């Protein structure tokens, strides 16, 4: 059970514009991050307004999850519940999961198939495109009560979000005049995005969900921080998945600096070959570690890509993982400044052999809330949140590779984090 029953039950404390005049970014704006971006309720409310409800494409589903007419998935844009549904004409609608009558959340199931959506409170009903189609006792009873004569159903449907898809991935936005997803992501990010999502039909293998008691932005920072990868993760280093000597890169989109790809090429050896000087820098390296089942480390070269590992951050709520042959997406759902939910979807391809499916599932133990890698990230992020909440210090230092902002060819870099916060400050007005 999550600490807060439903991690997503948090409501906005104040719908008015929060007063942010008290907040001042450090003078060296690129190389320091103030603690209050992780802990302030006022900052969080503006993030919801300007980022999640602003001019961004938010991941909401994979088309493979809703293949048939009426199939739906309950999802989120920021903290806001939405319904992703396949309509009768084959298109995808994304609707705010809030009855137009009294605001009740009308869809509570995670997935299902419906011909319509009916609010449990007063039974108002909507079609799959969110149009209001039925109101009990609309004209009253015995010539008394009911809606006024000028009430128009077409004026009271569910809020419809802008929708786009790219090779089976569904994005939605509260912004009604969004640029194309291709423009939004940029060629640098699309290159590796399209390696995983090439248009091949996906096969969903399963889901994880976990709550992390930390600020949602920390998870984005973590995957724009290749510096930590070879220091925190013993598994990555010992078994050669990402080592300081491997060919690697941290790639940021050149337009906004908010999307990124952390990439590395695994060497052929199952176990890392690391010189003694490098070992001294990495306390996470432990000589003699091995696996009882070496099949876990096998890498099947299935893509036309130089990388064996790519971790993509797509602002503001999506991570696309390709860790050797385990594939998945992670959706970030914020729940105030000090908590977020991570929703994981693990998949393969419809044309995978049974052997390949078994291999993906076996290797899938790398990821997830208690995976060989996922567990350590969650704990480290929690430690940072505890530190910024309790300490009297007020800034974080991001000076590694200080000459770059955005893309870097070094793993010992925080350039992508700096690029993210440069854009963040512009959007947030900080």
Task: Walk through the language-model features, giving the residues of each.
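N-terminal short leaders/motifs
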Residues: 13-43, 111-125, 157-167, 261-297
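C-terminal catalytic domain of Rieske-type non-heme iron oxygenases
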Residues: 3, 86, 91, 97, ...
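Short, charged helix-to-loop "capping" segments that act as catalytic/coupling loops
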Residues: 48-57, 129, 138-148, 391-394, ...
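N-terminal pre-ligand scaffold of iron-sulfur
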Residues: 1-109, 159-165
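Short Pro/Gly-enriched beta-strand edge/turn motifs at strand-loop
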Residues: 54-66, 142-147, 311-316
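Short, charge- and proline-biased low-complexity linear segments
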Residues: 59, 65-66, 137, 235-242
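Rieske [2Fe-2S] iron-sulfur-binding domain
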Residues: 65-176, 183-187
């Amino acid at each position: 059970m999550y600490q807060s029953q439903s991690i997503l039950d948090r409501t906005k404390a104040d719908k008015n514009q929060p007063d942010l005049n008290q907040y001042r970014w450090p003078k060296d704006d690129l190389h320091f991050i103030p603690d209050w971006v992780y802990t302030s309720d006022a900052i969080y409310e503006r993030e919801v307004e300007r980022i999640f409800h602003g001019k961004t494409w938010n991941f909401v589903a994979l088309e493979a999850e809703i293949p048939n007419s009426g199939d739906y998935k309950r999802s989120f844009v920021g903290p806001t519940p939405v319904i992703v549904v396949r309509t009768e004409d084959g298109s995808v609608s994304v609707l705010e999961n809030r009855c137009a009558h009294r605001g009740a959340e009308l869809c509570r199931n995670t997935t299902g198939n419906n011909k319509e959506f009916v609010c449990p409170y007063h039974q108002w009903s909507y079609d799959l495109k969110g149009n209001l189609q039925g109101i009990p006792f609309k004209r009253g009873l015995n010539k008394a009560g009911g809606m006024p004569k000028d009430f128009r159903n077409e004026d009271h449907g569910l809020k419809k979000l802008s929708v786009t898809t790219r090779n089976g991935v569904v994005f939605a936005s509260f912004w009604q005049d969004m640029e194309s997803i291709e423009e939004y992501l940029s060629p640098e990010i699309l290159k590796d995005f399209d390696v995983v999502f090439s248009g091949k039909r996906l096969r969903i293998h399963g889901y994880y969900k976990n709550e992390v008691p930390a600020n949602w932005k920390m998870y984005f920072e973590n995957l724009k921080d290749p510096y930590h990868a070879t220091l925190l993760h013993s598994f990555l280093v010992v078994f050669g998945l990402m080592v300081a000597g491997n060919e690697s890169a941290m790639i940021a989109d050149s337009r906004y600096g908010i999307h990124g790809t952390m990439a590395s090429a695994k060497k052929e050896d199952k176990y890392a070959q690391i010189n003694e000087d490098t070992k001294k820098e990495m306390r996470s390296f432990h000589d003699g570690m091995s696996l009882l089942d070496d099949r876990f480390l096998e890498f099947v070269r299935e893509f036309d890509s130089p990388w064996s590992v790519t971790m993509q951050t797509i602002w503001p709520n999506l991570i696309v993982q390709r860790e050797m042959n385990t594939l998945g997406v992670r959706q970030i759902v914020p729940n105030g400044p000090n908590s977020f939910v991570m929703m994981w979807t693990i998949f393969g391809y419809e044309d995978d052999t049974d052997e390949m499916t078994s291999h993906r599932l076996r290797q899938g133990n790398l990821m997830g809330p208690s995976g060989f890698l996922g567990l350590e990230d969650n704990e480290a992020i929690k430690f940072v949140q505890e530190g910024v909440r309790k300490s009297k210090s007020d800034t974080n230092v991001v000076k590694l590779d200080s000459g770059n902002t955005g893309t870097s060819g070094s793993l010992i870099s925080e350039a992508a984090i700096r690029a993210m916060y440069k854009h963040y400050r512009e959007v947030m007005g900080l």
